[in-house]
Regions:
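Face-selective signature of the C-terminal outer-membrane beta-barrel domain
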Residues: 309-328, 344-528
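Transmembrane beta-barrel wall of Gram-negative outer-membrane proteins
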Residues: 249-284, 290-370, 374
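Extracytoplasmic beta-strand/coil segments of soluble accessory domains associated
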Residues: 145-190
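C-terminal beta-signal and adjacent terminal beta-strands/loops
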Residues: 643-646, 650, 654, 661, ...
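Gram-negative outer-membrane beta-barrel transporters
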Residues: 506-508, 662-827
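Short acidic/polar hinge/loop motifs at secondary-structure boundaries
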Residues: 65, 189-219
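Short, acidic, small-residue-rich periplasmic hinge/interaction motif at the N-terminus
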Residues: 30-36, 43-48, 75-81, 91-135, ...
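A beta-strand signature from Gram-negative outer-membrane beta-barrel systems
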Residues: 97-99, 205-247
Length: 955
């Protein structure tokens, strides 16, 4: 921690030295509509080299100071308009610039409908604008993953599919929690999932209204140190801002319907009182169109107020207040195919608010300072109403105390008979809040431009839900105990970061950009076993523009490199495993002389196992890349390696316990019974002679009970090669060809020793099974690897004169090889399957003593010398589900084709149509593991044939 602070101070002092030697220049002007000349207030002007920017005031004026001399690139953006870049050669202050933005339209010469590599960024960064989203009819933010290099389309683009974003990962089933480590933020506010008790997964994006999105930025490479609590990159969503026309969207797909309406209101003359953006979106998806009753609904409302203050003083203050909400969820109450009055309701309510103040004093020692506060509250209550029946009354054990208990209507109650409905409610209310302060310095030195930002973040995560409970506690099912989420401590985190972006120009038109940053996170969990933990995250990137000239074959050549460490905080599921209870019946009398039955149970609670040695999961990321522009053809190639260390993994812990079991008497109706709560001994009292009492004989039963403990697993490695080739436009055909793809390799092999046993079998001596095996990993396969080669070829024809754009995309998988692994497997077990023997085992009597498990030959010999021990130990052998479980599987190449069409009709109407797998490819693919040919139809390899149409109105 001390070294980190010293490094931060050193970087800051170096930045101050640079600032004192600065010779800055000023650029000012106006941003107006190209057709009407009206000012475009709240447009943004961004200096691309430093990522410093400003917001246009109500008169359309902007001023950006402290810019370096020489060539600088400015990007001007405004929602609904095509962005524009200005390249200026600054030798003195430049004023009076008039930037004329044209409305985004297919009549423009340049239109993008795919993910574009961000310019002037050393790390891999892709940008997807509104035109691309409309052309591809995005209804869920996670759908944009298909637009990345090598990305694959999904057939059913509906809200029923709660797919989580997992950057640079083939699937969310891989080890290392790839989706949990992929961060999502909307207008700078993190959409977190740390407060969930039921999963350790990425945040769901179904509550985010897509019709209100202006653009999406996807950082798959090294993220800025400004962003913490991640390990696999970040997705940044930017929503609409500024004065906009009334827009109405309607989308129709087989499983999904969507309608939205939005507008940016000018409050007062020339927006002197600010601008209010409002958007409402209704969307509904059905699970099955032949029985459209199980559905997911999204009712999203967005209100956003923006205002420029203190414009006259030359140091504008931008005030933004955002409020986003969603009322929706999944519902199956109306399904006539289900049992009468049975249903499942899952709320997906969200309320997110944010206040941001951005002040730009443009001083020598301070360029910009931003203060932001945000809060996110969710309601994920789930109700499940089930139909139950029982011919006899069953005991429900609800005690939380260890020992023997009698069904007396308190700790153990007797359930009803006949038919009834039972309503179970799982109440989860995650809360995330944060306070953020960020400052920026921007200056120019004699031979180098320098941009420094530093900040502090405070975030907290918790859950105010009640957990699982029942509407009628007398009907609470067996083994239910109350476990409230709102009693668990909140997780608090303070992040400190500093980042220095240095840029050195060369005489040949090239330049070198180096970004170095350091982040320190301090995590505190009060009243828990974890206390306070700290983590240090250094990150750095380099971008070398070797030369820049349009007079040679190589118009530009850019080399990039990067490294970084990113730390992912744990979820509440990881931090707070629940207490488990083992309930075993120790006595059942049958009906006694009074017509009653006596039931006794022994309860053994296994307290929540907190791992005080738990380490925070982190990733080490490395990147190398090259970009080139050769005669109008733009080429980008990136090589990456991501290693996830200390991933969060759940493991089973087995604890021995014992109790006294008493068999019932044959003539039960002649006695009454009492049970000792401490010893479990049963006393029978004769009805004919109450003085005759006898303690019934009992036997001691030895059992194991299990509980979950979260630990750190083995390192997971992902590496690959990504490429994008945008060929020069074929002017005669108005067509551009794009080839993108990725060569991806994943390897995860769990080497951590984990326990496993069966709790349902018995030993040779008749006792419940008491042996525990210790294996590498918690499955039959300790790990797996997978290599894929995906390539997409997209032909985009854009005819501006008729406002038409057509894209045809071929998605091809040329290579798919995967294999499960386990170094200790024995093939040919029982002639067909594979068997895995544990490395060690323990017994009920000595749970802490690990005994080496016999080898296959020793186990065979044991069968002759001690058949009982052999039979007991053989139960620990884990067997594969198929004979080809560990066989390398090579899939033959396969492909699908998508068609997208967008047509503008006049100035106010546009229509988009798309069809995935429109050829409905049903060819066969070959699997080497099974040596079989299987149809691609509904195989999951390619999307099913699917289509949709969207109508947009701008008034």
């Amino acid at each position: 921690m001390k070294r980190a602070l010293l490094l931060c101070i050193s970087i800051w002092m170096a930045a101050q030295a640079i600032i004192l030697s600065a010779q800055p220049y000023l650029v000012s002007g106006r941003v107006v509509d190209a057709d009407t000349g009206e000012p475009l207030d709240f447009a943004t002007v961004l200096h691309l080299e430093s990522r410093q920017g400003t917001t246009v005031d109500t008169d359309g004026a902007f001023s950006l100071g402290r810019l370096p001399g020489g060539k600088v690139s400015l990007e001007i953006r405004y929602f609904g308009y095509a962005s524009q870049q200005l390249v200026l050669d600054l030798r003195k202050d430049t004023t009076g610039i008039v930037v004329q933005l044209k409305k985004a339209s297919l009549k423009l010469e340049e239109v993008t409908v795919s993910a574009e590599r961000a310019e002037l960024e050393a790390s891999t960064d892709y940008h997807i604008d509104r035109t691309a989203m409309d052309h591809n009819q995005i209804v869920n933010v996670s759908d944009v993953m298909a637009l990345l290099p090598g990305g694959k389309s999904q057939g059913d683009l509906s809200l029923m599919n709660d797919e989580r974003l997992a950057l640079r990962s083939e699937s969310n089933t891989e080890k290392g929690n790839p989706a949990f480590g992929s961060a999502i933020e909307v207008d700078g506010m993190r959409i977190g999932n740390n407060a969930e008790m039921s999963e350790t997964n990425g945040a769901s994006t179904r509550t985010l209204s897509t019709s209100d999105i202006e653009s999406i930025e996807i950082v798959t490479g090294i993220a800025s140190v400004e962003h913490g609590d991640l390990s696999n990159g970040i997705v940044k969503v930017r929503t609409r801002r500024g004065k906009t026309p009334l827009s109405v969207d309607a989308t129709v797909k087989p499983h999904t319907k969507l309608v939205s309406i939005g507008k940016g209101f000018d409050l007062g003359r020339n927006s002197e009182n600010g601008i209010l953006n409002a958007n409402f979106e209704w969307a509904r998806s059905y699970k099955d169109i032949s029985s459209p009753y199980t559905s997911y609904t999204r009712n999203g409302l967005t209100l956003r107020y923006s205002r420029q203050l203190a414009q006259e003083q030359g140091s504008p203050l931008l005030l933004c207040v955002d409020l986003k909400g969603n009322v929706g969820g999944q519902n199956s109450t109306a399904d006539p195919d289900a049992f009468s009055d049975t249903y499942t309701k899952k709320r997906d309510y969200a309320l997110r608010g944010q206040i941001r103040m951005d002040w730009q004093p443009d001083r020598a020692w301070l360029s910009e300072i931003e203060l932001r506060a945000d809060v996110s509250m969710q309601d994920k209550r789930q109700k499940v109403n089930t139909n139950c029946n029982s011919a006899s009354s069953q005991p429900y054990v609800h005690t939380t105390e260890q020992g023997y208990h009698i069904a007396d209507g308190n700790t153990i109650i007797m359930g009803p008979t006949g038919y009834w409905y039972n309503l179970a409610i799982t109440d989860s209310k995650p809360i995330d809040a944060g306070l953020h302060l960020k400052a920026k310095w921007s200056q120019d030195w004699t031979f180098m431009s320098n941009y420094v930002k530093a900040g502090v973040d405070y975030t907290l995560s918790g859950n105010n839900g009640k957990g699982l409970h029942y509407e009628d506690l007398t009907l609470a099912t067996e083994n239910w105990r109350e476990a409230r989420y709102d009693t668990l401590p909140f997780m608090h985190n303070i992040g400190l970061y500093v980042e220095d972006r240095m840029r050195m120009p060369f005489r040949n038109g090239g330049n070198l950009q180096v970004v170095l940053g350091l982040r320190e996170d301090l995590t505190h969990i009060a009243k828990s076993e974890y206390g306070t933990a700290s983590s240090l995250s250094p990150r750095g990137t380099m971008r070398w523009n070797v030369f820049g000239s349009k007079k040679r074959t190589f118009e530009s050549l850019i080399l990039t490199a990067g490294f970084g460490k990113a730390v992912k905080l744990p979820s509440m599921q990881v931090l707070y495993p629940t207490t488990t209870y083992a309930d075993w019946q120790t006595f059942a009398s049958g009906t006694d002389a009074l017509g009653q039955a006596v039931y006794a149970y022994y309860t053994n609670p296994t307290r929540a196992l907190y791992n005080r040695d738990l380490k925070w999961q982190y990733s080490l990321q490395h990147e190398l890349g090259v970009e080139a522009l050769i005669k109008g053809t733009r080429i980008s190639v990136t090589c990456f390696r991501n290693a996830t260390h200390n991933p969060y993994v759940s493991s089973n812990i087995y604890t021995p316990f014992s109790y006294e079991y008493t068999a019932p008497l044959a003539n039960a109706d002649q006695y009454t019974y009492t049970v000792d709560g401490q010893t479990g001994k049963v006393t029978a009292t004769s009805l004919s002679d109450p003085t005759q009492q006898s303690v019934l004989p009992s036997e001691t039963v030895h059992r194991l009970t299990s509980n979950t403990k979260w630990i750190n697993g083995s390192t997971v490695v992902r590496k690959g090669l990504e490429w994008v080739i945008d060929f020069a436009k074929i002017r005669a055909l108005n067509t551009q060809i794009r080839v993108d793809g990725d060569l991806y390799h994943y390897r995860g092999n769990e080497r951590t020793l984990m326990a496993y046993t069966t709790l349902t079998q018995k030993q040779s001596d008749g006792q419940p099974y008491g042996y525990v095996g210790y294996y590498r990993g918690n499955n039959v396969a300790t790990g797996s690897y997978k290599t894929t080669l995906n390539t997409n070829v997209t032909a985009t024809t854009h005819i501006p004169v008729i406002s038409l754009i057509v894209s045809l995309r071929f998605e091809c998988t040329f290579l798919e090889v995967s294999q499960r692994t386990n170094d200790r497997r024995i093939d040919g077990y029982m002639g067909y399957y594979s068997a895995v023997l544990p490395e060690y085992y323990s017994t009920w009597a000595n749970p802490d003593e690990l005994v080496r498990y016999p080898s296959a030959d020793e186990l065979t010999a044991l069968k002759e010398t001690d058949v009982n021990l052999y039979n007991d130990l053989a139960k620990l052998i884990r067997i594969s589900s198929t004979g080809y479980f560990f066989t390398k599987d090579r899939i033959s190449p396969y492909f699908s084709t998508n068609l997208n069409v967008t047509k503008e009709i006049g100035k106010h109407v546009s229509v988009s149509f798309y069809a995935t797998n429109f050829w409905n490819n049903t060819s066969l693919y070959h699997s080497s593991a099974t040596d079989r040919n299987t149809s691609l139809y509904e195989s999951g390899k390619i999307p099913s044939f699917y289509y949709g149409i969207t109508l947009k109105l701008k008034l």
